[in-house]
Amino acid sequence: MKMTKSDRIDRIVERLAEMPAVEKVEPLAEGICDRISVIQRRLMLRHKRSLGRHGISWRDWQVLTNLLLGGDTPRSPSDLASTLMVTTGAMTNVLDRLEEAGLTRRVRNPADRRSVIVEATDDGVALWYAAVNELGSQEAGVVSVLTAAEQRQLNSLLRKVLAGFGDGDNWDEETA
């Protein structure tokens, strides 16, 4: 692998290490975590711009993704709100917007006619596929600086770091 020259994070970590009152910062860990954070922010900005070109927000995308990747379990508005950690009022606004755009619909729950479930429409599914392919291309471009073997190694190492939080697949909770 071709080594890159030092970057801004290296310089920040070096200055941090020189500060006498900073005792608990491990420079290597700081560099790793800072880089993960910067990569996440940059990728999120690219994704949000792409989703905007498709006429949806990040939150809209999360709802469609949960509907399409959530398996066969019907999803209620309150279930979606809980999964995405937003209020039911905020979820109502998102669902109203998606329904107005023709991307989702609320239908009576056949198991309990007092409640509704949310479904993606054919247009919602088509938009999701177009967007997921665009986002996937962006992600592939980001890691294309690595060989396939390096990508597998990085993926394995990041999985190990993520497992180190010790909370299983509960990775999207803000209680960490």
Go through the PLM ranges and name each one:
Residues 1-24, 149-152, 156-176:
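C-terminal regulatory/oligomerization modules of transcriptional regulators
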Residues 27, 37, 41-87, 169-176:
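N-terminal helix-turn-helix DNA-binding core of bacterial DNA-binding proteins
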Residues 96-156:
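Charged, amphipathic alpha-helical coiled-coil/dimerization segments
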Residues 31-38, 62, 153-156, 160:
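Amphipathic alpha-helical interaction segments
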